[in-house]
A protein has these predicted regions:
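Extracytoplasmic ligand-binding site segments that recognize negatively charged/polar headgroups
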Residues: 120-130, 140-164, 203-219
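Bacterial Sec-exported substrate-binding components of ABC uptake systems
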Residues: 2-4, 17-63, 167-204, 314-320
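Structured C-terminal subdomain patch of bacterial secreted/periplasmic proteins
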Residues: 153-167, 176, 255-320
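Proline-aspartate-enriched helix->loop->beta-strand connector
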Residues: 105-118, 244-261
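Short helix-initiation/N-cap motifs at beta->coil->alpha
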Residues: 40-42, 95-106, 236-245
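Alpha-helical, coiled-coil/dimerization segments enriched in small aliphatic residues
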Residues: 81-87, 213-241
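A short, structured surface patch at a secondary-structure boundary
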Residues: 56-111, 115, 120-123, 232
């Protein structure tokens, strides 16, 4: 199944590029006459022409750009959480990597960027490369993934971001093609999910030693629900929360989803859970039911079908 999702995505990219080559004149006409105005998290973006020197910060934003075939419009990227999505690797290799973490304001200016697309609003501040207002004063438009700012974001929220980026770059048709393909891939995965009398109780383990940092009403909660399971902390009014080990044990998770990113490996997290006096008492640990998911796949980007497949395969191995 995973290979099928990858093949379909790669085929879409090839088709999108071919389609754009055939309609270059139409795109150029649209770019020269249309002014795009988008409201984005308190900032009004007024784009008189498609950006040609874009920078992405945060991997799920980078992968949206690459899935739309916009690598030639990029002058830099920064901050990977995990391995780049396989069908996008070749396109990613064509983009200069400015930093493994956050690029500096000086790096941004040196690239002569005209657009910055960030996955998280937290990167737009004085400690990193400047506020959105400051960058706007430098004639650098910015866009923050709105779906990453919401409590309980939906797949449609992600599609709104994809449509907005496609609109800014004047490639609306390509954006709709990508959304259509993601929907097809989602249907391919969810069609195999069995009906169950009781949803599996799932705990997300991101990190923590004395407490547990876990998903509440984040996009990962949305994904878990889409495959027919229940996030045991999905009733909390936030995206990610810190809870006590005792509370996690009391909710008796049957499966633990491990977010995989950064310097602490998934194997190390699983080892910690097995050795922890409290968390090792959960049914999930005692039955060694762990599902590892790359953080970017669980984020508000283009890897929704891959994320659903990973979760469903771990939850219902007999069906996959």
């Amino acid at each position: 199944m995973k290979k099928r999702v990858w093949i379909l995505t790669a085929a879409l990219l090839l088709a999108a590029c071919t389609s754009d080559e055939q309609s270059t004149k139409d795109v150029e006409t649209e770019q020269s006459t249309d002014v795009v105005t988008i409201e984005n998290e308190g900032i009004t973006i007024v784009s008189e022409q498609a950006p040609t020197r874009a920078i992405t910060v945060n991997q799920h934003a980078t992968e949206v750009m690459l899935a739309l075939g916009l690598e030639d419009s990029m002058v830099g990227t920064a901050y990977l959480d995990d391995a780049i999505y396989e069908p996008l690797q070749e396109a990613y290799n064509q983009v200069p990597v400015l930093s493994e973490t956050s690029p500096s304001k000086e790096q941004i200016i040196e690239t002569e960027a005209d657009f910055i697309y960030g996955g998280w609003a937290s990167f737009f501040n004085e400690k990193k490369f400047g506020s959105r207002e400051e960058l706007q004063a430098l004639e650098i438009d910015t866009y923050v993934q709105s779906s990453s700012m919401k409590i309980a974001p939906t797949v449609e929220d992600v599609y709104t971001d994809i449509r907005n980026i496609a609109k800014i770059f004047r490639i609306e048709q390509r954006g709709e093609q990508l959304i259509s393909q993601i929907n097809e891939d989602i249907d391919t995965v969810t069609a195999k999910i069995p009906n169950t009398e009781k949803p599996l109780d799932v705990l997300v383990f991101d990190s923590g030693e004395t407490e547990v940092y876990t998903a509440a009403q984040s996009f990962l909660n949305t994904l878990i629900t889409m495959v027919g399971a229940k996030n045991v902390f999905g009733d909390m009014e936030d995206t990610w929360v810190i809870v006590s080990k005792e509370d996690a044990v009391e909710r008796s998770p049957e499966v633990i989803v491990i977010t995989d990113y950064g310097s602490t490996t998934a194997e190390e997290k699983i080892r910690f859970l097995k050795n922890d006096p409290a968390l090792s008492q959960t049914p999930a640990v005692q039955n060694e039911r762990f599902v590892v998911i790359p953080l970017t796949a669980a984020s508000e980007g283009v890897r929704i079908a891959e994320a659903l497949e990973i979760l469903a395969t771990g939850f219902y191995p007999e069906a996959f």
